[in-house]
C-alpha cells in the first residue's frame, strides 16, 4: 500500500509509520521550539530568478516571526514587496505542524489572493522532510487538514468568512483594500472567534 497522499510523492498520507532517528527527534524538537530556525532551515520558496530556493530571511523577517510566536495579536503596516506574506506563511506552517488541533484562517481582499497564499504554504509543506510532515487528511486549493488535527482554510474577507468557527490564528492579508463597511462587519463577526 502506498504511503503517499493521492499519488503526490512529496506528501505523506495519514497513518503512515515513520522511523525517527535520534537526529530527527532532536531536529523536530529544535524546530518546534524555534520558528525562525525552522523557517531558515526548512522553508522553501519560489524565486523569480532561481526557482525553488531556501527562504533566506532578513533580520526584520526574523523579528516578525518572533513577534508572531510571542504575541497573540499582531498588526503589521508594511510596504509592498518586502516578503511579509512569505514570512507570515512560514510561521503559519510552523504553527500548524507543531501544534495539534489548531484552526488557521488565511483571509485576503480576494479569494484568489488567499488561495495563492495557501498555495505558497502548501509548496513549503511539500518540501519538508517526510519525517517532519504530519500526514494529510485533506488537501485542496481552499483548505488542508493534517493528521494532528490542524486545519488551514483560505477565503476572501467578508463578515461570513469565518462565521461558525473558532480560530487560533487569523491572517488578514491586503486588509487595507477591504471597504470600511465590510471591515466593520467582519470585525463584529470575527472578534468573538479569536
Name the predicted role of every residue range.
Residues 2-194:
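Phosphate/NTP-binding elements of NTP-utilizing enzymes
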